[in-house]
């Protein structure tokens, strides 16, 4: 699958998803830059990554009052997501949403356990 198509599907999914989030979470989501990338390797610290990541949150979390001017960013690695989902469009779209919500949870200051407790690893928001 080509990156342009995967980007288009991801963009559609993310726009739909943000619209149905609770208002406070929706407002938080709008403060985060979303970067759709083919795969890890384009970031300055990517040499520390395994290469099979689906997404990554970088920058200050919403709880940090002073982020030193750094912009919070969620990076989604579309080729990894595509391969992870068995190259099925429906599953890919679902996983884009799930991965975004998971990384958004980190922006909100939640650790892995708190993200899981809210169901964000399964695409649900509690």
Residue ranges and their predicted role:
Residues 52-97, 107-126:
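Active-site scaffold of zinc-dependent metalloenzymes
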Residues 20, 24, 99, 103-107:
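Short alpha-helical functional segments enriched in proximate histidine and acidic residues
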Residues 4-9, 44-50, 88:
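N-terminal start-of-chain detector that recognizes signal peptides
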Residues 18-75:
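Auxiliary, metal-adjacent structural segments of Zn-dependent hydrolase domains
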Residues 1-3, 36-45, 80-81, 119, ...:
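Generic detector of short, locally flexible boundary/turn motifs and exposed helical patches
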């Amino acid at each position: 699958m080509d990156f342009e198509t995967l980007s288009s599907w991801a963009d559609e999914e993310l726009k739909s998803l943000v619209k149905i989030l609770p208002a406070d979470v929706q407002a938080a989501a709008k403060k985060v830059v979303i970067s759709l990338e083919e795969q890890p390797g384009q970031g300055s610290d990517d040499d520390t990554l395994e290469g099979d990541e689906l997404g990554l949150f970088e920058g200050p979390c919403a709880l940090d009052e002073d982020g030193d001017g750094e912009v919070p960013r969620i990076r989604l690695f579309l080729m990894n997501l595509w391969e992870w989902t068995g190259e099925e469009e429906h599953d890919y779209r679902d996983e884009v949403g799930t991965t975004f919500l998971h990384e958004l949870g980190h922006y909100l200051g939640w650790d892995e356990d708190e993200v899981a407790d809210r169901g964000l690893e399964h695409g649900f928001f509690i």
